[in-house]
């Protein structure tokens, strides 16, 4: 009886202790949930954080605050410490999605589960432009890429020279991991180049009498020559006619390249006298390398050029960017005289 009385007397204390324990467990569970699984990032849309060799954990936290609308940066830091993440940061481009939790993001960061970047390049003329365009989209620096593109031994290992390396790059959109090295990026482009040059395309180039690199060089001239893409196959056919006939190309864009000024509106005799292997008024055949990185459309226009007898072309006097084509020199001279007259009328020197 006394024992029952003792138990009954202590019952409120036991209930209180159990209640406290439940509260503690519940509170601990809520704390763990809030720390690990509760949504902690609420950007308006998926954003990306970037970690390179120079960034530390504090830099990452700043990105999460500024770009990913982190609600509780302290909890992210706390869980990162518990998981020893700051000591094992991996470079890369990581997605932060609306409603993401600390643990989900940290699992991606710790395992290096990054999201590939969509790398695009087009309308690129010089290697310096290419290096800048690509380095703006990937982790490596402009100089890292330029160093390889200008290295004759490296280019030779890929079947190119520093003058022809432009031809390696086929303009398109590629999914590439942001932290790729410059060397691996170039080798990825080499695989894309090899995939582009199918047996069918190789056969077409061979039938014309061109290697893939020579086809790229010619395509670059074609694209610089006309602003009207529907003229590409006609212009390509014209230059192929001249190559087969042993006639110098006499392509104005090659002179502009030799001069180093693509803004020239009028090619003068002094420009034609520049002694450069790119000056196709002085040197027969194709120049040593592409004037720009040709597009797929430009390359295909060479491989599928229009068959005709044109040997001459001159910009139209309406300055539309289109051309008058001619079979004979006499016809060409008439076209050229009309164009020169319009240049004079507009006082373009």
Question: What is the predicted function of each stretch?
Answer:
Residues 1-16, 46, 53, 62-68, ...:
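Intrinsic structural disorder
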Residues 19-24, 66-68, 91-93, 144-149, ...:
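N-terminal start-of-chain detector that recognizes signal peptides
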Residues 2-46:
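N-terminal type II signal-anchor transmembrane helix
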Residues 21, 49-52, 97, 207, ...:
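Pocket-edge positions in alpha/beta enzyme catalytic cores
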Residues 30-197:
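Signal peptide-directed extracytoplasmic domains
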Residues 120, 138-143, 147, 154-349:
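Bacterial extracytoplasmic/cell-wall-associated proteins, especially those involved in peptidoglycan
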Residues 5, 9-15, 33-35, 62, ...:
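Polar/charged alpha-helical tracts
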């Amino acid at each position: 009886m006394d024992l029952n009385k003792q138990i009954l007397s202590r019952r409120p204390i036991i209930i209180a202790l159990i209640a406290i324990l439940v509260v503690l467990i519940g509170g601990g569970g809520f704390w763990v949930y809030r720390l690990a699984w509760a949504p902690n990032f609420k950007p308006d849309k998926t954003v990306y954080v970037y970690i390179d060799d120079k960034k530390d954990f504090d830099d990452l936290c700043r990105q999460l605050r500024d770009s990913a609308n982190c609600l509780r940066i302290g909890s992210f830091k706390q869980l990162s410490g518990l998981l020893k993440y700051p000591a094992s940061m991996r470079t890369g481009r990581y997605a932060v999605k609306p409603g993401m939790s600390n643990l989900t993001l940290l699992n991606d960061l710790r395992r290096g589960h990054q999201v590939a970047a969509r790398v695009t390049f087009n309308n690129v003329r010089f290697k310096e432009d290419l290096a800048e365009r690509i380095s703006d989209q990937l982790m490596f620096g402009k100089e890292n890429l330029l160093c390889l593109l200008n290295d004759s031994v490296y280019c030779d290992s890929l079947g190119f020279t520093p003058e022809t390396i432009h031809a390696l790059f086929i303009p398109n959109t590629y999914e590439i991991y942001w932290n790729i090295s410059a060397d691996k990026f170039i080798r990825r482009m080499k695989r894309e180049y090899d995939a582009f040059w199918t047996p069918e395309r190789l056969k077409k180039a061979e039938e014309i009498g061109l290697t893939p690199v020579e086809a790229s060089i010619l395509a670059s001239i074609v694209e610089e020559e006309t602003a009207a893409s529907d003229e590409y196959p006609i212009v390509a056919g014209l230059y192929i006619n001249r190559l087969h006939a042993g006639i110098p190309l006499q392509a104005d864009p090659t002179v502009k390249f030799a001069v180093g000024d693509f803004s020239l509106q009028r090619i003068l005799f002094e420009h034609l006298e520049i002694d450069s292997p790119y000056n196709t008024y002085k040197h027969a055949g194709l120049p040593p390398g592409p004037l720009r990185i040709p597009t797929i459309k430009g390359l295909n226009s060479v491989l599928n050029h229009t068959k005709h007898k044109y040997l001459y072309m001159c910009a139209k006097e309406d300055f539309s960017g289109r051309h008058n084509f001619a079979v004979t020199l006499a016809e060409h001279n008439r076209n050229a005289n009309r164009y020169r007259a319009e240049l004079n009328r507009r006082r373009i020197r």
